[in-house]
Amino acid sequence: GEGGVFGAMLSIAGADTNFFLVAEEDCDVLYVDYDHIMKRCPKACAYHSTIVRNLVRLMAEKTQALSEHLEILSHRTTREKLLAYFHMLAAKSRSSYFTLPFSQTNLADYICVDRSAMLRELANMRREGLVEIDRRNVKLNLHKTL
């Protein structure tokens, strides 16, 4: 997404690894030499401290997102994965109403399931009154999903 960072963890870990990345849309990539960032500049300027602080914050956010994704993927069935993800989004929005951050195709990819199987499961969940879905808008009926 906009303002995103990739490869930072590899740089910090000292990994000498190549990786392949595909952007979903046009973007600019800025290469920043890790060693240059981590060494204090001679003036110990505030800009340098801000860059380091922002980099650490971005890495913490990435770590949290990866942890959340792993938690969702740890569930066995498509229904369990969907409910885990929906409960997480509901908790973040502090509401049973939330908007999916991406398309249903990307949702299927995110939870590592077949799209048609996921859509079938969503239809079953809708029929059982667990969720109400209108495109990307979701209402999770919490009293039925606990």
Model-derived segments and their meaning:
Residues 54-64, 81-88:
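An amphipathic alpha-helical interaction segment
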Residues 36, 65, 103-106:
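A general alpha-helix detector
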Residues 78-81, 87-146:
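Phosphate-/nucleic-acid-contacting segments
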Residues 18-19, 39-48, 65-74, 92-95:
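Short helix-to-loop capping/linker segments positioned immediately adjacent to catalytic or ligand/cofactor-binding
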